[in-house]
């Protein structure tokens, strides 16, 4: 039986980064898919700590909050930098990913039609810090921090991939980010995951907007 279980809606949402991480690290996991109807009418929501998903099970450890789950996997699988300095930088980068993801989620679920144009216009300013971080680490030819992949890389990769769907060409003026996406997407296990039916057929968001 797989050691990990992801309990989540039938979308990529806040779980695709952890799926990328697990796939790339050669880990197996079980998916428990929760439909919107069962979430609203069933009892699961009342048992969830914050009344929300994802719920993540690692043996008898149950976690909520997607970034707490990523950090747990980072610690467990050696994906948290090589020392405390790198760990702090990984946290900083991941917090930046969360900031932009929150903006994205707000757009998708609350003001897509009227807000998309302004969002796309402002997007370069939100992407620039990640280009800067890459430029400060081995000329942008490695990872977001240090010389080994971290949980923040998987989170950033997912964020960039969904923005390329929202705004094709959004990375055209960011050569380091463009190369970074290509480089990480070419890692054999990530490449296999990204081309798998599970990923391809899984909607990005729950309302059909992307």
Swiss-Prot record:
Residue numbers carrying N6-acetyllysine: 128
ATP-binding as UniProt keyword: no
Domain GST C-terminal: 83-204
Domain GST N-terminal: 2-81
Modified sites of kind N6-succinyllysine: 103, 116
Cross-referenced Pfam families: GST_C_3, GST_N
Subcellular location: Cytoplasm; Mitochondrion; Nucleus
GO BP annotation list: glutathione derivative biosynthetic process; glutathione metabolic process; hepoxilin biosynthetic process; prostaglandin metabolic process; xenobiotic metabolic process
Ranges annotated as spanning the membrane: none
Keyword Metal-binding among record annotations: no
GO cellular component: cytosol; mitochondrion; nucleus
Chemical reaction(s) catalysed: RX + glutathione = an S-substituted glutathione + a halide anion + H(+); prostaglandin J2 + glutathione = prostaglandin J2-S-(R)-glutathione; prostaglandin J2 + glutathione = prostaglandin J2-S-(S)-glutathione; prostaglandin A2 + glutathione = prostaglandin A2-S-(S)-glutathione
Primary enzyme class: transferase
Residues found modified as Phosphotyrosine: 4
Enzyme Commission code: 2.5.1.18
Entry GO MF terms: glutathione transferase activity
Keywords: Acetylation, Cytoplasm, Lipid metabolism, Mitochondrion, Nucleus, Phosphoprotein, Transferase
Sites where the protein binds glutathione: 8, 14, 39, 45, 52-53, 65-66
Assembly and oligomerization: Homodimer. Interacts with CDK5.
Function: Conjugation of reduced glutathione to a wide number of exogenous and endogenous hydrophobic electrophiles. Involved in the formation of glutathione conjugates of both prostaglandin A2 (PGA2) and prostaglandin J2 (PGJ2). Participates in the formation of novel hepoxilin regioisomers. Negatively regulates CDK5 activity via p25/p35 translocation to prevent neurodegeneration.
Family: Belongs to the GST superfamily. Pi family.
Name by which UniProt lists this protein: Glutathione S-transferase P
């Amino acid at each position: 039986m797989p050691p990990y279980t992801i309990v989540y809606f039938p979308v990529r949402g806040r779980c695709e980064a952890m799926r990328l991480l697990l796939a790339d690290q050669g880990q197996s996991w079980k998916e428990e898919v929760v439909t919107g109807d069962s979430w609203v009418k069933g009892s699961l929501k009342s048992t969830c700590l914050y009344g929300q998903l994802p719920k993540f099970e690692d043996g008898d450890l149950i976690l909520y909050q997607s970034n707490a789950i990523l950090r747990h996997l980072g610690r467990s699988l050696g994906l948290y930098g090589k020392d405390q300095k790198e760990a702090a930088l990984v946290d900083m980068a991941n917090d930046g990913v969360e900031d932009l993801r929150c903006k994205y989620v707000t757009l998708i679920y609350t003001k897509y039609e009227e807000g998309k144009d302004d969002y796309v216009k402002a997007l370069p300013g939100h992407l620039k810090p990640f280009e800067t971080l890459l430029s400060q680490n081995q000329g942008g030819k490695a990872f977001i921090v240090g010389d080994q992949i971290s949980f923040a890389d998987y989170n950033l990769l997912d964020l960039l991939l969904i923005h390329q769907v929202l705004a094709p060409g959004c990375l055209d003026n960011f050569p380091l980010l463009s190369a970074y996406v290509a480089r990480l997407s070419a890692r054999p296990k990530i490449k296999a995951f990204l081309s798998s039916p599970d990923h391809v057929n899984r909607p990005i968001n729950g309302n059909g907007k992307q």
